[in-house]
């Protein structure tokens, strides 16, 4: 059954070919995002920041965390502008809004996969992945 355009959640929809064509560009962005997120959640960095913060706002640890935060923000905005949905930074899991038989679904890709080969309903998530073929 076809979903009326007014009820669609996403303006942009990808075909599998379009999504696959973006992977060479998106994969390095996802890797950079994961690295920047790791810097933000690094326990040693947080301990150093906690020790340095009372003196003057954090010094080098504060700068490092600030730079990592800005990098995460910049990369997430770039991915959103590209029309993709980041589902899990650690896994490198992203979804591409798509239309399947007239209804909105997600094409699903995880860092390390050669191509977009799965899809799932908008509310199903990773466990609901089904092969495209």
Regions found by a protein language model. Name each.
Residues 1-48:
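Long, hydrophobic N-terminal alpha-helical segment
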Residues 5, 70, 91-93:
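Residue-level detector of functional hotspots within protein domains
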Residues 29-32, 36, 43, 61-71, ...:
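Amphipathic coiled-coil alpha-helices
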Residues 38, 42-45, 49-52, 91-98, ...:
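A sequence-level detector of short, solvent-exposed, charge-rich linear segments
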Residues 49-61:
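A short, surface-exposed helix-loop junction/capping segment
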Residues 77, 81-133:
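Glycine-rich, aromatic-bearing surface loops/beta-hairpins
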């Amino acid at each position: 059954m076809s979903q009326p355009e007014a009820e669609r959640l996403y303006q942009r929809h990808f075909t599998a070919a379009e999504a696959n064509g973006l992977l060479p560009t998106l994969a390095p962005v996802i890797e950079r995002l994961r690295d920047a997120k790791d810097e933000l959640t690094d326990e040693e960095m947080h301990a150093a920041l906690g020790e340095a913060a009372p003196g003057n706002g954090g010094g080098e640890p504060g700068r490092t965390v600030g730079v990592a935060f800005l990098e995460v923000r910049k990369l997430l905005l770039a991915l959103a502008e590209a029309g993709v949905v980041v589902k899990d930074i650690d896994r490198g899991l992203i979804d591409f809004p798509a239309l399947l038989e007239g209804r909105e679904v997600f094409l699903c890709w995880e860092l390390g996969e050669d191509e977009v080969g799965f899809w799932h309903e908008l509310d199903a998530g990773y466990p609901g992945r089904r092969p495209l073929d």
